[in-house]
């Protein structure tokens, strides 16, 4: 039982490190990051939970969600998603793209 718990803890800790490393890489690349509950705070959010790290566009307020443009998938060269993918690749991260979000796992990114 202890071995299972230790393995789960190691995965959780690895995903936490991965989420922080992904956030840092995106910030270093100049990607517009989300700022919680602030007008004009919409941006890319890195969510760490369970066995995945997810990267997606997050609107800071409901008003922005209804009225702001959708830079995540803009027609002009793919929008912010293209920036995020390039930054992740440049930083050496392996990820999957489900068409909406990017997903990363510690198992595929043990270098963090």
Give the predicted meaning of each segment.
Residues 23, 67, 71-73, 85:
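Functional cation/ligand-contacting sites centered on basic and imidazole/sulfhydryl donors
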Residues 17-18, 83:
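Generic hydrophobic/packing signal
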Residues 18-66:
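An N-terminal amphipathic alpha-helical segment
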Residues 48, 57-59, 71-81:
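A signal for specific C-terminal beta-sheet/loop modules enriched in small/flexible residues
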Residues 1-8:
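N-terminal, Lys/Arg- and Ser/Thr-rich interaction peptides
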Residues 75-112:
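Short, compact, well-ordered microdomains
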């Amino acid at each position: 039982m202890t071995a299972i718990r230790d393995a789960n803890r190691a995965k959780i800790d690895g995903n936490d490190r991965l989420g922080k490393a992904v956030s840092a890489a995106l910030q270093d690349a100049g990607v517009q990051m989300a700022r919680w509950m602030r007008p004009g705070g919409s941006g890319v959010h890195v969510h760490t939970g369970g066995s995945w790290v997810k990267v997606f566009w997050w609107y800071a307020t409901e008003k922005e969600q209804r009225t702001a443009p959708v830079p995540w998938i803009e027609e002009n060269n793919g929008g912010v998603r293209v920036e995020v993918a390039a930054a992740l690749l440049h930083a050496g991260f392996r990820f999957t793209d489900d068409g909406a979000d990017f997903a990363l796992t510690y198992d595929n990114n043990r270098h963090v």
